[in-house]
Amino acid sequence: MSTEKFTITEHLVPGSHIREYPGSTVNQQDVLKIHVKNYTPKREGPVPDDAITFIATHGVGLPKELYEPLWDELLDQASGFHIRAIWMADVASMNQSGIHNEDKLSMDCSWMDHARDLLLMINHFRDQMPRPLVGIGHSFGGNIITNLAYLHPRLFTTLLLLDPLIQLSPPSLGFGTDAPSAINYTLWRDDVWPSREEAIRANRAIMQGMDPRCLDRMTKHFFRDLPTPLYPDVEAIKARFGTTADSTTTPVTLTTPKYHELVAQIRQNFNARDPKTGRIEVPRDTHADMDPLVAYIPLYRPEPRSTFRRLETLRPSCLWVIAGATFLNIDEIREGVKICGSGIGGSGGVPDGRVREVVLPGFGHLMPFQEVKTVAGTCVVWLQQEMDRFRQTERQWKEDRDGKSHQAVEENWYKVLKPIPTGRKKRSDKGKL
């Protein structure tokens, strides 16, 4: 249990000012709150100077508490490195953050907002987060943590991307010739049940194969007792299910409302086509990130493609842990691995040993909850290598800086920058008009 291995401290911090999309909040100036958990290992003795601070990001609609068994395994398997703390925040519209913000949230969501929220959180708690920092993200959280690295290239020493949603092609959208997908399921699914027990039974398919530790957290944190703003009338819900009014059984709904999960998965583009002329015109005030070539499609999601296109510039080293049976486009993800960090500003990529891909055959997208030990062990091997490199780099930096002045530039500046001539040539007036 995480409480046996970690001291867990909860925080509520403000989100970043001005959201990416004006429709993310009821009023554009609304201040959102971000619910944060800080997991600090219970240990005897001082914390080593090079102990890692992890910044973690979750998948769409998945409570951050589901990842606690993964933190337990990382701590148990850690060898060649130490853990200072693990920090994880719920996205503003999801889980505990969503509950705190439910009177301010509206029907839009940008993944970029959480990257900015995390940067704000890191600055807020900077005194507790000395280097090295390591980012770890699952699913759309892998995309978000990558964008945080784009925002601040030297922030992270390395990234651990667990089946990240970084690809060029959109998912199946369930219209035209597309088969229904997770997006269709999210919109049309049931989202209220007469009891927690009934909710667990109804959702057993998504819980199938989960580690018992994750399953326990799923039953506690994935559902929420009524009333909620979406379902304020408990008696009406009881009547719908034929439950007596005096019953002590409490109806439940999803902790993250399905509509917030939906708009995080996909974004609407319903107004690009002029109803009078039939012409497609991108409404740039609200949809500037829409590719004009595909603006005829009524749904889109910009971040997977835009993040993929910047992979060459990714500065921190990166481990890609890919689920062999993922529903994502695995071929495109692997193409991303090939170019990751290979361009100007990047880490050097695969050729320099700064990027590695590990495919776990047979594992699905929810592998952090189903194969906890294996996923943790894969990350540990990479962290051992990267921490050895970090220590070597730090030692070399200190040696190179030893004895240097911090008040004046070194002699090489005077060798490279030639002095300005002291004499002035007589000015000619021949060129005057």
UniProtKB/Swiss-Prot annotation:
- Cellular component terms (Gene Ontology): peroxisomal matrix
- Please list the residues that make up the active site: 139, 163, 365
Q: Name one GO molecular function term.
A: hydrolase activity
Annotated GO biological processes are:
mycophenolic acid biosynthetic process; terpenoid biosynthetic process
Q: Does the keyword Transport apply?
A: no
- Principal place where this protein is found? other
Q: Which domain of life is it from?
A: Eukaryota
Q: Where is this region: Abhydrolase domain?
A: 58-246
Task: Quote the catalytic activity from the record.
Answer: mycophenolyl-CoA + H2O = mycophenolate + CoA + H(+)
Would the keyword Transmembrane be found if you checked this record's keyword annotation?
no
Q: What does this protein do?
A: Type I acyl-CoA thioesterase; part of the gene cluster that mediates the biosynthesis of mycophenolic acid (MPA), the first isolated antibiotic natural product in the world obtained from a culture of Penicillium brevicompactum in 1893. MpaH acts as a peroxisomal acyl-CoA hydrolase that converts MPA-CoA into the final product MPA. The first step of the pathway is the synthesis of 5-methylorsellinic acid (5MOA) by the cytosolic polyketide synthase mpaC.
Annotated protein name in UniProt: Type I acyl-CoA thioesterase mpaH
Species of origin reads: Penicillium brevicompactum
